[in-house]
Amino acid sequence: SETEYRQIMDLSPRLKEVIQRHNVFYHIPRAGSGGDSVMIGLHYEDKIYGPLYFDYLQNLAPDDPIMQTRNAFEDMILDGTPESVLILVKASPDTIANRMRDCPHHRQVIQEHDIAHILSRFEDEFVRSKLPNKLVIDTTHHTVEESVAELVKGLGPFFTEEDKQRLDSHKQA
């Protein structure tokens, strides 16, 4: 609700960070959890948008307990789901700006003047990531359908034998 949204947004930066860190920690798959999972944004978005728009994670040293916890997120992902694939979905700054204007979000966070910086930060986080399985999808000149097809094709090399067997069983059904 709008009331709940305002309550969250009115929290101190420290409390917003604590809540978001808990949310990220909660959604990281644990070892042996089995099954498939999709994690969108997770700690990457938070590392980028937190300092830029929500006034947290600014000027924290790597040995700060908050950063030590946050820096362990990828180790947790690797421990719980070592086959995870990190996907960087990107588009040109102009394409993103046009899409934001053509289809505005009710509570748009990203500001048009920040797009180039945000793209650069996501690229930095992608390159720095410990996750070994990586894929880049550039949607600049592609429709949603074309981008999904590129994603499916790009994920192919990362499928485990079990994944391939499950896909085959769905095709036969």
List each language-model region with its residue ranges.
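A glycine- and Lys/Arg-enriched "phosphate-lid" helix/loop adjacent to the NTP-binding pocket
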Residues: 49-125
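Small/polar loops that bind or transfer phosphate-bearing groups
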Residues: 7, 40, 88-89, 139
